């Protein structure tokens, strides 16, 4: 008797990455740009959100390019979250580039070149062109294969409400149809110049072909009139992409590899002239985007002098900078300045300040983060985490949500309790307890000499994190 073999079923774990700001979906403003108490993942910071909403409105109207905004506030007050909310509100049509100030320091290219490339990435060019397209509903697709299977030929029957035509298909078009999974009843558009096929949706006449449809299935009317028609097509590319494509040393392949290297300023000048001609002819329009530079105090004096000039150029995006420093040394100099930024650049920026969160706001943020990470918290555990967030930092409390959930799963519980939070609180120390431990065991650590930073400041109660001592450490 033949044996019946059974195979075990394995579930494939999908990769899910929950970022620090993945819960932010916008700025949470109403139509009058008034901030809602809790909306789109944003809580508190009403004045800062309203100011950011005003900036977004001016960007959408194209009236604030070439300006600079500085967001300042203590750590864990939502500066980066507001920038992410601005990016979500602006949408995919407006170029938004996020950059950390330490990213500009590279051995492959100069600091000013890295900043210039970030500037050019943040400026879009909307190019309009007229294309011939074939648009209609697919009636039938016939594909014939040769005996060897090397060649494929076929016929495509496509119709509108007024006419119907049969097209002969070659290998490339058959592959494109199979890639887009085009079947009878789909409404498609074929670009005659490039052969690109776009699936517009499914015809209403085929709505009852299947009992069940996917949520992404879109039903459209069968097109009317001629099959072949002229259509305005809009492409949005950044100035940096045009620079790379026209760079002889790399060419367009550098767009995929990312190894663009330095681009000559003469080439950029020629592209600016050409884009200016397209604007005058009505073929293109400039879309000023947003460049967000986080931890801007990490830039040095050469970068700041470059920003002074770049902000006043004709093609400049809106530059948003964020810093959590107070009065500290400007990198590359011996001078001290507010937020580590030179006075002449501070004179050019609009400053938005963020304030520490209140207890109710912290509780709401932790609730949103727990829902985002699919963690069920008991009310008592949420209260303990809120108190921890106010006494230590918001980031520390958010990190404890995931670890406390793991501790709850170890004891096969569905909800995180206070005992789980206390367990991980004892396992992972926060910044204040770490400093206290360092004070108690200072002699056992390898310390730097007084020339760079006096460890005795620990014993005298001098502030360490995010204050004066950190500015000295950055300069060292």
Curated annotation (Swiss-Prot):
One of its GO terms (biological process) is rRNA processing. One of its GO terms (cellular component) is NuA4 histone acetyltransferase complex. ATP binds at residues 72-80. Pfam families: TIP49 (PF06068), TIP49_C (PF17856). It is found in: Nucleus. It catalyses: ATP + H2O = ADP + phosphate + H(+). Keywords: Activator, ATP-binding, Chromatin regulator, DNA damage, DNA repair, Helicase, Hydrolase, Nucleotide-binding, Nucleus, rRNA processing, Transcription, Transcription regulation. The keyword Repressor does not apply. Its main location: nucleus. GO terms for molecular function: 3'-5' DNA helicase activity; 5'-3' DNA helicase activity; ATP binding; ATP hydrolysis activity; DNA helicase activity. Its EC number is 3.6.4.12. DNA helicase which participates in several chromatin remodeling complexes, including the SWR1 and the INO80 complexes. The SWR1 complex mediates the ATP-dependent exchange of histone H2A for the H2A variant HZT1 leading to transcriptional regulation of selected genes by chromatin remodeling. The INO80 complex remodels chromatin by shifting nucleosomes and is involved in DNA repair. Also involved in pre-rRNA processing. May form heterododecamers with RVB1. Component of the SWR1 chromatin remodeling complex, the INO80 chromatin remodeling complex, and of the R2TP complex. Belongs to the RuvB family. This is RuvB-like helicase 2. The lineage of its organism: Eukaryota, Fungi, Dikarya, Basidiomycota, Ustilaginomycotina.
């Amino acid at each position: 008797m033949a044996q019946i073999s059974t195979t075990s079923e394995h579930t494939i774990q999908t990769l899910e990455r929950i970022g620090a700001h993945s819960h932010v979906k916008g700025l949470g403003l109403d139509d009058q740009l008034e901030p809602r108490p809790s909306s789109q993942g944003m809580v508190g910071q009403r004045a800062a959100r309203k100011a950011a909403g005003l900036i977004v409105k001016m960007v959408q109207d194209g009236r604030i390019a070439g300006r600079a905004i500085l967001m300042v506030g203590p750590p864990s007050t939502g500066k980066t979250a507001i920038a992410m909310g601005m990016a979500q509100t602006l949408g995919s049509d407006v170029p938004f580039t996020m950059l950390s100030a330490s990213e500009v320091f590279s051995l492959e290219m100069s600091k000013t070149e890295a900043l210039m490339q970030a500037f050019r990435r943040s400026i879009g060019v909307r190019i309009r062109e007229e294309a011939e397209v074939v648009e209609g509903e697919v009636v039938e697709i016939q594909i014939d294969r040769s005996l060897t299977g090397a060649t494929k030929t076929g016929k495509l029957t496509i119709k509108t409400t007024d006419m119907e035509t049969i097209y002969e298909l070659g290998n490339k078009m058959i592959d494109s149809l199979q890639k887009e999974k085009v079947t009878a009843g789909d409404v498609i558009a074929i670009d005659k110049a490039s052969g690109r096929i776009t699936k517009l949706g499914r015809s209403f006449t085929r709505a009852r072909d299947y009992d069940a449809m996917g949520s992404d299935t879109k039903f459209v009317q069968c097109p009317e009139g001629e099959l072949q028609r002229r259509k305005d097509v809009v492409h949005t590319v950044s100035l940096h992409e045009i620079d790379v494509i026209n760079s002889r040393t790399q060419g367009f392949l550098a767009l995929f590899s990312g190894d663009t290297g330095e681009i000559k300023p003469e080439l950029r000048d020629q592209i600016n002239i050409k884009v200016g001609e397209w604007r005058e002819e009505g073929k293109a329009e400039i879309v000023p985007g947003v460049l967000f530079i986080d931890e801007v105090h990490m830039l040095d004096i050469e970068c700041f002098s470059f920003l002074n000039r770049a902000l006043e150029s004709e093609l400049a995006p809106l530059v948003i900078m964020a810093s959590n420093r107070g009065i500290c040394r400007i990198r590359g100099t011996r001078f001290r300045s507010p937020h580590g930024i030179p006075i002449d650049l501070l004179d050019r920026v609009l400053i938005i300040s963020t304030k520490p969160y209140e207890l109710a706001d912290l509780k709401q943020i932790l609730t949103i983060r727990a829902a985002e990470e699919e963690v069920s918290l008991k009310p008592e555990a949420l209260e303990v985490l809120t108190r921890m967030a106010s006494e230590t930092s918001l980031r520390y409390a958010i990190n404890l949500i995931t670890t406390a959930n793991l501790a709850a799963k170890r004891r096969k519980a569905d909800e995180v309790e206070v005992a789980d939070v206390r367990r991980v609180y004892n396992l992972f120390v926060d910044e204040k307890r770490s400093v206290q431990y360092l004070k108690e065991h200072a002699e056992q650590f390898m310390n730097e000499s007084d020339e760079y930073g006096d460890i005795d400041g620990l014993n005298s109660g001098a502030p360490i994190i995010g204050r004066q001592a950190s500015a000295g450490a950055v300069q060292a």
